[in-house]
A protein has these predicted regions:
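Bacterial Sec-dependent N-terminal signal peptides
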Residues: 1-21
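Alpha-helix capping and helix-loop boundary segments enriched in small/acidic/polar residues
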Residues: 32, 80-86, 120, 145-152, ...
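Glycan-recognition surfaces in beta-rich domains, encompassing non-catalytic CBMs
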Residues: 373-483
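Active-site-surrounding "flap" and adjacent substrate/cofactor-binding loops of secreted or lumenal enzymes
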Residues: 52-83, 89-92, 109-123
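A structural-propensity feature for long, helix-poor, extended segments
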Residues: 74-95, 338-368
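Catalytic phosphate/nucleotide-handling subdomain of diverse soluble enzymes
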Residues: 49, 56-69, 186-189, 197, ...
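Active-site cavity-forming subdomains of large catalytic enzyme subunits
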Residues: 33, 37, 41, 45, ...
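Accessory "access/gating" subregions that flank catalytic or transport cores
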Residues: 27, 133-134, 142-151, 162-170, ...
Length: 486
């Protein structure tokens, strides 16, 4: 009898779960497009607003009395002055193009090859991932910390916006795409940063406040991860001290400003770690109280990657409110460049608006939603928590040594530990002198000279790496496509 009763109870419980209604988001074609446009526009506005301060305030915030400019013609000015500023956008565009041409079910390998052979400048985890793929190291190995010391950097985080836009209110689908894309260049907290951003955008289509958006987005990141703990600290701190964002900034500085991986930032005040910069995103969303202007201003004034962070904040709020509700003060300068083509792509903002809209509708239908007669219905499903992955566990940098020398033949050094990173640049002396290179590179720790080659210089330096008398591997360092880190 006891067994029969138990079976009956389980059967009744299962029937009860199946009977629970699924929450559905209903909106019109026009409303969906408006939100998608708002995401792209807010993202681009944020990256331009933070342009003059990017990594110029490391270990400090920007004082309230210091003006940050914005005016008519300002977006066009930065478009012409520094095309590489828009890496937040053109990396997204590469993947949007890939999904458009290869289909929504395209493989990780197909996406990796599109990314690795895109003709624009990359840095940090993106550049290391590109190098790995071009050497035959495919994802997820290309983003693994043992092959990519930038694995915890925020690269995937700054190019994951498009995922939430093509998967509106569809968190499980957003995380599936994030897993395919994010492990091309990142892993661990670096991967979680992009998954978090994708979830922020996706949930912004139906959540009504920054608090709710953050709560939903962080719920998919494993609680055991340092990324989750860092973002949760921001949420908890804000609940206790909701008035002054600088108090939260100091708290984060003390507890979480500790990068152990990025070769450019280790032992320095430069921090491009995903969790710290995502924490600044969360901080700005909470203390900005949903106001577009205040939120991107706070995200910028937090410092470090102060163009990418307001870019994410602006994009998420752009989705929540929609394109038409972004203040004209911000939107009008953007409209000047909406038809301009991003570097290394065939994409403009105008094309991105439409392409993301089309992809979103395809994915909605594919996953059981409805698109009919100008009306859209999206079933909102619970997403599973991502698997736990952590980089650099029980691994810490021991020392940083500065050499400031040219490698023209051989270079030898001794080290203690289980690994090393040599960080530098390959430079062409056709147009500049070794003296100039030396003066720039020794200006301060972290100074670098961009690879000044002809635009299509085919030269590739071959550098043999020998360890304990045995050839470990041969590094191929191209002059083309911007700087090539040793």
């Amino acid at each position: 009898m006891r067994k029969i009763i138990t079976i009956c109870i389980i059967g009744l419980f299962a029937l009860n779960v199946q009977a629970q209604p699924v929450k559905t988001l209903k909106l019109s074609d026009k409303e969906l497009l408006d939100k998608i446009k708002g995401g792209w526009a807010g993202q681009t506005i944020g990256v331009v607003f933070g342009a003059p301060t990017e990594f110029k305030f490391t270990g400090t915030y920007i004082q309230d009395y210091q003006p940050i400019p914005w005016a008519e013609g300002y977006v066009k000015y930065w478009w012409e002055k520094k095309p590489g500023l828009f890496d937040d956008i053109y990396n997204d565009c590469t993947f949007v193009e890939a999904f458009d041409e290869l289909g929504l079910d395209c493989s990780q390998e197909e996406l990796a090859k599109r990314f690795a052979f895109a003709d624009y400048h990359l840095a940090h985890a993106n550049q290391a991932g590109r190098y790995n793929i071009r050497q035959g190291i495919m994802p997820p190995a290309s983003g693994h910390w043992l092959n990519n010391p930038h694995a915890d950097d925020l690269d995937f985080q700054i190019e994951a916006d498009f995922i939430g836009l093509m998967a509106p209110a569809m968190l499980p689908e957003a995380l599936d795409i994030a897993s395919r894309v994010g492990h091309i260049m990142n892993s661990g907290d670096g991967f979680y940063g992009g998954a978090f951003v994708a979830a922020l955008y996706s949930s912004a289509f139906y959540e009504k406040s920054p608090e709710a958006i953050l709560k939903t987005a962080i719920s998919v990141i494993p609680e055991e991860s340092t990324f989750h703990q860092c973002i949760q600290d921001v949420i908890n701190f804000h609940s206790l001290h909701p008035d002054n964002w600088k108090d939260c900034w100091y708290f984060l500085q003390e507890k979480w400003n500790c990068d152990v991986g990025c070769p450019k930032g280790v032992f320095l005040n430069f921090n491009i770690d995903a969790k710290l910069n995502s924490a600044f995103i969360a901080l700005a969303m909470l203390y900005g109280k949903g106001d577009f202007t205040n939120s991107i201003d706070i995200a910028t004034r937090c410092g470090q990657d102060s163009d990418c962070n307001p870019s994410t904040v602006g994009g998420v709020l752009g989705v929540m409110y929609g394109y038409d509700k972004i203040p004209s003060f911000w939107l009008n300068p953007l409209k000047e460049v909406e038809d301009f083509t991003f570097e290394g792509t065939n994409m403009s903002l105008a094309k991105a608006y439409q392409m993301s809209f089309d992809q979103a509708k395809q994915l909605i239908v594919k996953t059981g939603g409805k698109v009919s007669g100008g009306e859209i219905e999206i079933p909102i499903k619970r997403a599973d928590i991502l698997p736990l992955e952590q980089n650099f566990e029980k691994t810490y940098p021991l020392y940083r040594e500065r050499k400031d020398c040219f490698l023209t033949d051989t270079f030898e050094f001794d080290f203690n530990g289980n690994g090393f990173v040599i960080w530098g640049n390959i430079c062409c002396t056709k147009s500049i002198t070794p003296d100039y290179i030396n003066r720039v590179s020794t200006r301060h720790i972290g100074s670098e000279v961009f690879g000044l080659a002809e635009p299509n210089d085919p030269y590739v330096a071959k550098v043999e790496i020998w360890i304990d008398g045995e050839l470990d591997h041969v590094a191929a360092l191209p002059m083309k496509l911007g700087r090539a880190h040793v």
